[in-house]
Design a protein with these regions (language model features):
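Short, small/polar-rich motifs associated with maturation and membrane association
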Residues: 1-451, 456-457, 462-465, 471, ...
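Surface-exposed loop/interface segments of Gram-negative outer-membrane beta-barrel transport/assembly proteins
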Residues: 197, 213, 273-274, 279, ...
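Residues on the lipid-exposed face of transmembrane beta-strands in outer-membrane beta-barrel proteins
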Residues: 340, 415-421, 451-455, 553-557, ...
Length: 931
């Protein structure tokens, strides 16, 4: 998708934003405009002039209205509607507000009295007592009607005989109400939100609303309260323990760091097993910064962490591949569907939220304090080890890593605004997250701004939904999981025989070099020695700044009552700047032996563009059969570019600027990638008597990763059946709902990018291009996951719900690099083999009951998953060496002495330690020390 097209889309969204803002202002201002009038014995015209001065409204007076009559009015900071009612009280004048005008006309009471009609009035409110503005009030069976005003009030003439007539009150988003008039002339009407009636409707793939009883797979609903009651900077962490079958692990990066969500076990050897995030039916590529190893220093962040939890209406969690098959390969590991809030018609509502959280470590590793600084039972004054001579009680400093950590806090403040008319609703929110971490000099700040406008046009046949978000994030020293740039390592390993208070003054003036130098007596280890943890925090700062903007637009056109066509588009761009400053006297390996420091500056850009169009059909035949069909196409285009400049400082020490770098050692690596997937999909559901449902879906992807491969695209189907015995048979009243379901799905996943064409990376060590490439070229096939699921859903004893599922997922044809010898001139050799199986059970038991004015809601979840490597590599033929290879063991990666090893019969994620343990007997007290 070229830049010109993207620019046109941006201009189009800007135009829609301005137009929708203008329309929404008419309705919103009418509900919020307030006036103050304290006028006695003045002409009505004078009151009208004062209202025009205090608001942006103008009066239009019809013939017969006496604006010269004397009135008195006394209102202070009241809505415009109340002031107008006070102005016309006791007169034969009535008013009506339309856009920016207030129309005054002669009341029709006198005429009504002559024809025998009756005037009735009332007020329309919601369940919270808030006036409902613009509610339709109609005399049933006639065309006589009106709308409720700014304060929810209404009045109209009911033709004779009024005693037998009925009022029909309706408003979008609420259940309609019918009341009989009888002899009553005033009515207080309460409208309930329609969600209370359609609670069995859930959001599924592509934002499609489906009846819960028709689903052949597990979809767990999570309300917004789950992520807003106790807020986390990354709302995903708030879902831990609330979704059966999902394991949520927080990263080591602290506040704002990424969260790893694994549903139903790890499946792929070399590719991600993380969940897909979908916002308002549109999938989002979750850009995640790479984690660090021994020498890394950059923490991990992700795109989903930018989201404001107060913007979330609900979350639907699909743990199985069948549930998310319409999203294709991205959803092979499950999907989390997020529905955001939109404006609600009625009086403008403003919500202010403030949340403060204090943080202290819940538990730290256990450390020994009996042995002092040194090794093998011998004292040493310049080592990081704590296995020296035994310490007597007086020589123990009782140091704990908690002495290095501080009490952290997270301050979250947000404001949301919602309102509008029945035809146009607006939503706006802003939020700020400000945090100080547990580690000194660790900070995280994020600011969110969101706008959304929904309009019903062309007699409600056309729905236009546009939104925009702008996010600013700044963080400092997000903790990485490495060794030499992680302050926690040296804080944990600080010798128990040394005084930690001495190293808190982490730098000393060096008169010879005329700079402040690192103070760290525990300097054993040469070039790989640890550093003072305070020096890392304050003199190895890592700062990241991100600016992200998102534009989303959707149009739905209603062709008939049972058919509509919808189109959506989303543009999501992020610009980032990352800097790392290593002061002089830092670890010489990290400084590349520079005596003056080192500086890194990295600029990155992430771009996502998504668009789809879909035809939706929902029709019932002969009151027995129901058809729900969806067919559509989509395009997804993701890009990432990053340019770095780094090197040792050549000029004045500790002056961090790219122009101060050593030109002979300065490096400017550039990385990036571009992926595009074009898709065609369908979903077909057939229902019989609302008790038996058969669903099938299909999707075909043309992924750019498959270019120059034998299989240019891949198709993945799913099929499911659900049956409601509680509707087929007469169940006892206390056991009122039972659904049995089964589903099967096959989901494909393309292999990693850049494996189908020869690639030659730039090698900084030789200042040229590497002449080696990977093997094979053009002979790779997609990975495939096949899933079975059986389960049931039950409701009983007036409030209990029970959901249980059994599943099995088998992943085949995995692509990985076994680090085989590539002596024939290839950089890497990739093989496709392997079989990983996940078998498990999910269950959730809930209870929800309402007692008049209070509610009890609780839920218990249970998950069990067995991950097993069935086959790793069996009789794979190596065309380079002409050997047949079989492997039942493969080392994927390592961190120090810890190794990630795959073994047949083992499971994904098994870690093995090869550390040698040295036991030294202490004859004095017969204790054993471990070195």
């Amino acid at each position: 998708m070229n830049n010109k097209f993207i620019q046109q889309i941006k201009c189009w969204f800007t135009f829609l934003f301005i137009i929708c803002s203008t329309f929404s202002a008419w309705g919103a201002y009418a509900q919020t405009a307030k006036v103050t009038l304290q006028m006695d014995n003045v002409r009505m015209e004078q009151v009208m002039n004062e209202i025009e001065k205090q608001t942006s409204y103008f009066f239009i007076v019809n013939k017969g209205v006496d604006i010269n009559r004397t009135i008195s009015i006394n209102v202070a900071d009241k809505p415009l509607g109340i002031a107008l009612q006070a102005m016309v009280a006791g007169t034969k004048t009535e008013y009506k507000i339309y856009q920016q005008n207030i129309y005054l006309s002669v009341s029709s009471d006198k005429k009504a009295a002559n024809n025998g009609s009756t005037k009735v009035s009332g007020v329309v409110r919601d369940t919270k007592g808030t006036p409902v503005v613009g509610a339709s009030v109609v005399v049933k069976g006639t065309t006589i009607g009106t709308s409720s005003g700014l304060d929810g009030a209404f009045s109209l003439q009911v033709p004779a005989p009024a005693q037998t007539a009925e009022l029909y009150v309706n408003f979008i988003g609420y259940d309609p109400v019918t009341v009989k008039i009888g002899t009553q002339t005033f009515f207080a009407i309460t409208l309930k939100e329609a969600a209370e009636q359609i609670e069995d409707v859930v959001i599924t793939a592509l934002g499609i609303k489906r009846s819960e009883k028709a689903l052949a797979y597990t979809v767990q609903q999570v309300k917004s309260e789950a992520v807003t009651t106790v807020k986390s900077a990354n709302f995903v962490n708030s879902l831990a323990g609330k979704v059966a079958g999902a394991v949520i692990n927080t990263s080591s990066s602290g506040v704002g760091g990424s969260a790893k969500v694994i549903m139903r076990g790890m499946k792929s050897i070399m590719q991600t097993s993380n969940v897909l995030y979908v916002i308002d039916g549109i999938p989002m590529h979750n850009f995640t910064s790479d984690g660090s190893m021994e020498f890394g220093s950059r923490g991990t962040t992700e795109s989903i962490a930018d989201m404001n939890p107060d913007d979330i209406e609900s979350i639907s969690v699909m743990t199985g591949a069948a549930a998310a098959a319409l999203y294709g390969s991205d959803a092979a590991n499950g999907a989390m569907l997020i529905t955001t809030k939109k404006g609600k018609a009625g009086a403008t509502q403003i919500q202010v939220s403030s949340n403060t959280e204090f943080m202290n470590p819940l538990r730290l590793p256990d450390f020994q304090t009996r042995y002092g600084t040194g090794r093998k039972g011998k004292a040493s004054g310049s080592t990081i080890h704590s296995w020296g001579a035994p310490l007597n009680q007086a020589a123990r400093y009782n140091y704990s890593p908690e002495d290095f950590l501080q009490t952290g806090h997270i301050l979250t403040n947000s404001v949301t605004l919602s309102g509008g008319t029945e035809k146009n609703q607006i939503y706006f929110s802003t939020a700020a997250v400000n945090s100080k971490g547990l580690v000194p000099n660790n900070k995280y700040n994020r600011y969110n701004f969101t706008f959304r406008n929904t309009s019903n046009l062309l007699n409600d046949r056309l729905i236009l939904d546009v939104s925009g978000s702008y996010i600013i994030q700044k963080d400092r020293n997000m903790i990485n999981q490495g060794v030499y740039s992680n302050p926690l390592v040296s804080a944990y390993l600080f010798p128990r025989g040394d005084d930690f208070s001495l190293v808190k003054a982490f730098e000393r003036w060096n008169p010879a070099r005329k700079i402040y130098a690192q103070f760290w007596p525990q300097g054993e280890g040469g070039d790989l020695r640890m550093q003072n943890p305070y020096w890392i925090a304050y003199r190895n700062p890592r700062e990241n700044s991100r600016k992200r903007y998102i534009f989303t637009g959707g149009i739905t056109y209603k062709i008939t009552d049972w058919m509509n066509v919808a189109g959506r588009i989303r543009i999501d761009n992020t610009n980032s700047l990352y800097t790392e400053k290593l002061y002089a006297t830092s670890n010489p390996t990290l400084l590349e032996n520079s005596k003056k420091g080192k500086y890194t500056e990295t600029r990155g850009e992430e771009r996502q563009t998504y668009g789809d169009v879909m035809l939706n059909i929902s029709k019932t035949f002969k009151e027995k059969f129901a058809l729900d069909a969806h067919i559509g196409a989509s395009i997804k285009d993701n890009r990432f570019d990053e340019l770095s400049v780094y090197g040792p400082i050549a000029g004045a020490p500790n002056i961090f600027n790219v122009v101060n770098l050593d030109k002979s050692q300065k490096k400017t690596p550039k990385t990036g990638w571009h992926e595009q997937t074009q898709s065609f999909f369908y979903s077909l559901e057939l229902g019989w008597k609302s008790q038996l449902f058969v669903t099938t879906t299909g999707r075909n992807d043309w992924a750019s990763q498959l270019a120059n491969s034998p299989q240019k695209s891949f198709f993945y189907p799913s099929v499911g059946v659900s049956w409601l015995p509680s509707s087929t048979f007469n169940f006892p009243e206390k056991f009122n709902y039972l659904k049995i379901r089964a589903s099967w799905a096959s989901v494909a996943n393309p292999f990693p990018r850049e494996l189908t064409i020869a690639t030659h990376p730039y090698d900084d060590t030789i200042s040229g291009w590497d002449d080696k490439s990977n093997y094979p070229i053009g002979q790779l096939y997609p990975e495939r996951t096949k899933t079975w699921e059986l389960g049931f859903d039950a409701r009983f004893l007036n409030g209990f719900t029970l959901t249980a599922s059994w599943y099995r997922a088998d992943t085949y044809n995995q692509t990985f690099n076994p680090n085989l010898s590539a002596s024939s001139g290839y950089s890497d050799i990739y093989i496709q083999t392997g079989h990983v199986r996940n078998t498990g059970v999910e269950a959730s038991l809930g209870y929800n009951h309402q007692w008049k004015n209070w509610n009890w809601n609780s839920q218990f979840t249970f998950s069990w998953n067995k991950n097993k490597i069935i086959e790793l590599c069996k009789e794979w033929y190596n065309p380079i060496t002409e050997e047949t290879i079989s492997m039942n063991r493969l080392q994927i990666s390592k961190l120090g002495r810890a190794k990630f090893i795959l073994k047949e019969g083992g499971s994904m994620g098994d870690l093995y330690s090869t550390t040698c343990l040295l036991y030294t007997s202490d004859a004095a007290d017969d204790r054993i020390s471990v070195d």
